[in-house]
Amino acid sequence: MTMTNDPVVIMKQEVGKAAASRVKSDSIVGLGTGSTTAYAIEYIGERLKSGDLKNIVGVTTSFQAEVLARKYGIPLTTLDVIDRIDVAIDGADEVDPNKNLIKGGGAAHTQEKIVDSLAEVFIVVVDSNKLVDKLGSTFLLPVEVIPKAVTPVMRQLEQLGGKPELRMGVRKAGPVVTDQGNLVIDVKFEGIDDPATLEKTINNIPGVLENGLFVGVTDIVLVGEIIDGKPSVREIC
């Protein structure tokens, strides 16, 4: 891994390494999206190169993850040709005490949900500031929507008590476009009391492909922290 003196970067590296160390030979691995997950992908590649890990294939959740996996020499497959995923590693934008998540800051939550929900073991890697008492406390809820349905979907999200905004690109003109060619609406809720019900309700709105609530799918959360100036990793099961 890249050498650095930045304790935050070192902490993310340690969390990624802790997750990657749980990958076993002869397995199919879901490879998620995000800065911490990127270190897990890198370390899986290092284990393959050293011979510590053998005969694995990855299933990626985004174009970003695919690029990283290929960079680090991880063989890839697709959901069309496999019937299981042994372990998936992914990040999150918020994690509540029940290990429910908000994901989608990278606009990849639809593919992430497909891969993560199929995994026998789903490991979430985060830093401690992603832990919240209630989902929606600090992060907007992403909703992927087909382009023609943006306006009616936004109206229905408002009726649910949300404040929706179309996500715009940072280094491009116009809105963010997902890997599926759709748009993303970010919705502010003043705390989500019942994430399971809200997840289903939003997904039943015509024009919505998927939203960023992940309910009841997480097995393990690996949390990176800086204690007394030093990085550490703790596990929530």
UniProtKB/Swiss-Prot annotation:
Q: In which pathway does it act?
A: Carbohydrate degradation; pentose phosphate pathway; D-ribose 5-phosphate from D-ribulose 5-phosphate (non-oxidative stage): step 1/1
Q: Does the keyword DNA damage apply?
A: no
Q: Name one GO cellular component term.
A: cytosol
What are the record keywords, sorted? Isomerase
Q: Which residues bind substrate?
A: T33, G34, S35, T36, D90, G91, A92, D93, K103, G104, G105, G106, K130
Q: Name one GO molecular function term.
A: ribose-5-phosphate isomerase activity
The active-site annotation reads E112 (proton acceptor)
EC annotation from Swiss-Prot or TrEMBL: 5.3.1.6
User: Which Pfam families does this entry report, sorted A to Z?
Assistant: Rib_5-P_isom_A (PF06026)
Catalyzed reactions per annotation? aldehydo-D-ribose 5-phosphate = D-ribulose 5-phosphate
One of the protein's GO biological processes: D-ribose metabolic process
Q: Which InterPro entries match?
A: NagB/RpiA_transferase-like (IPR037171), Ribose5P_isomerase_typA_subgr (IPR020672), Ribose5P_isomerase_type_A (IPR004788)
Subunit structure comment from the entry:
Homodimer.
Q: What NCBIfam families does the record point to?
A: PRK00702.1 (NF001924), rpiA (TIGR00021)
Described by its record, this protein's role is as follows: Catalyzes the reversible conversion of ribose-5-phosphate to ribulose 5-phosphate.
Family that this chain belongs to: Belongs to the ribose 5-phosphate isomerase family.
Q: Enumerate the PANTHER family for this protein.
A: RIBOSE-5-PHOSPHATE ISOMERASE
**Protein's name in the database:** Ribose-5-phosphate isomerase A
Q: Which organism is it from?
A: Rippkaea orientalis (strain PCC 8801 / RF-1) (Cyanothece sp. (strain PCC 8801))
